[in-house]
Amino acid sequence: MSSRPICRYIALSGTASRIWTLSLNTESCSTKTPLVLLHGMGSGIALWVLNLDYLAHNRPVYAIDVLGFGRSSRVSFSSDPAEAEQQLVQSIEDWRKAVGIDRMILLGHSLGGYLATSYALNHAECVQHLILADPWGFPQSPSQLEQSRMIPRWVRMVRCIISPFNPFSGLRLAGPWGE
């Protein structure tokens, strides 16, 4: 990157949660509508590294690690998909307020596209443009009864044992070597 990024944690009001934020060009183009980047599943700010200089050429750019990803706080999410979605959307709104952005261009990739869409539906007054790059979301899971019929008992037992472990736990344990 040729532009000098500013990286910092943004504390979310009323919680102990923090969102890791990379910003570029926030002073020299402060009159332009900022571009906010939301990464996808299993990703983080690094997803955008090859695009940041170009994207920040003539406007402020913010890339955030969504809660539970990258350097952002690990929080307990609801097991209800709709509630978990609202938790993530609210964290983006709390972040926007903390940073002081009135309106933004919101770009989401993959799961970030799903979250960007949900955010825009809930906070349309804050989104000037919505850009979706390969967006997707998780369908609601089948009822417990259907699920228990479809999955063999031994698989359910293994799932109970490993469910506390996140698939990216090994990467987090690697610390800086995992980047």
Regions found by a protein language model. Give the residues of each.
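Non-transmembrane, interaction-prone segments in cytosolic or luminal domains
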Residues: 5, 58, 73-75, 89, ...
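Conserved HGGG/HGGXW glycine-rich cap/lid loop of the alpha/beta-hydrolase fold
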Residues: 15, 22-77, 99, 109-114, ...
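An N-terminal hydrophobic leader/cap segment in hydrolases
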Residues: 1-11, 17-20
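Flexible "cap/lid" subdomain of the alpha/beta-hydrolase fold that forms the substrate-access gate
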Residues: 3, 31-32, 82-90, 97-98, ...
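Aromatic/hydrophobic pocket-lining residues that form π-stacking "cages" and hydrophobic walls in ligand
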Residues: 92, 116
